[in-house]
Design a protein with these regions (language model features):
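Structured beta-strand/loop patches that form or line metal/cofactor-binding pockets in enzymes
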Residues: 1-32, 36-37
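Conserved, mostly hydrophobic/aromatic
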Residues: 3, 28, 51, 89, ...
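Broad gene-expression machinery/nucleic-acid interaction feature
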Residues: 18-20, 88, 148
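Ligand-binding pocket scaffold of soluble enzyme catalytic domains
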Residues: 21, 27, 32, 62, ...
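Metal- or metallocofactor-binding catalytic centers and their adjacent structured scaffolds
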Residues: 26-101
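Alpha-helical scaffold segments in soluble metabolic enzymes
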Residues: 50, 88, 95-96, 107, ...
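Glycine-rich, aromatic-flanked loop segments that form ligand/cofactor-binding clefts
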Residues: 90-127
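Metal-dependent enolase-superfamily TIM-barrel catalytic cores that perform enediolate-based chemistry
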Residues: 116, 120-224
Length: 224
């Protein structure tokens, strides 16, 4: 079995475009992956074209070899652009491997752990600007059976956050918590943009609202 083509599919969605990838083979078995890179799909497509040239003719079942060859292809690793494209391709390769063996991918990764997987809602707040509007949207989502809500209440703050912006964010979180009660989990998104002191400050301020998690408060390359 050999890789013959990698096809991208750009899908318009709320606030951004989703990018899906289909890896095709000479035996008719194909796999699908996803590697959306927010607002940068053209860069993603460029990285994907580079990967297609490198992967053409290879056996898609040699996932580890393909991944390491692509990752080590150049001295500069490519950061989130290349890694998003490589991630999408890797998903598709696992899909191909599972199909070729006649088993779901979770069996290849060690088998099933749970019979059901809980989900959370994102985008439920579309159009909301003020705390009261977020509360109204949250009530509507909870009424539809949603048990976990994720959103970023921090506006355009970057690295640090002003007292006014933090107060606005906390009022928003408070309004949502009051609207849905303790039975709905709140997942607060940071989008990896705060420095460590600010992230710690925000986390302490969020604690009274008992969020399930504070996601990506600092940049992914903030290793210290």
């Amino acid at each position: 079995m050999k890789i013959t083509e990698i096809r991208p599919f750009v899908v318009d969605c709320f606030r951004t475009n989703w990018v899906f990838v289909k890896v095709c083979t000479d035996e008719g078995v194909s796999g699908v992956g996803e590697g959306t890179l927010e607002y940068k799909e053209q860069a993603f497509l460029g990285a994907l074209a580079h990967l297609q040239d490198a992967l053409a003719g290879q056996d898609p079942r040699n996932i580890e070899r393909i991944w390491h060859d692509a990752y080590r292809d150049a001295y500069w690793r490519g950061g989130p652009v290349l890694m998003s494209a490589l991630s999408a391709v890797e998903m598709a390769l696992w899909d191909i491997l599972g199909k070729s063996l006649g088993v779901p991918v979770y069996q290849l990764l060690g088998g099933k752990v749970n019979d059901r997987v809980r989900i959370y809602a994102n985008g439920w707040f579309s159009g909301a600007r003020e705390p009261g509007e977020f509360a109204q949207k949250a009530r509507a989502a909870a009424a539809r059976g949603v048990t976990a809500l994720k959103w970023d209440p921090f506006g355009k703050s970057y690295l640090s956050i002003s007292s006014a912006a933090l107060d606005q964010a906390l009022r928003c979180v408070a309004a949502v918590r009051e609207a849905v009660g303790p039975g709905v989990d709140l997942l607060i998104e940071g989008h990896g943009r705060f420095n460590v002191p600010t992230a710690i400050q925000i986390a302490r301020e969020l604690a009274p609202f008992k969020p399930m998690w504070f996601e990506e408060p600092v940049p992914p390359d903030s290793l210290e």
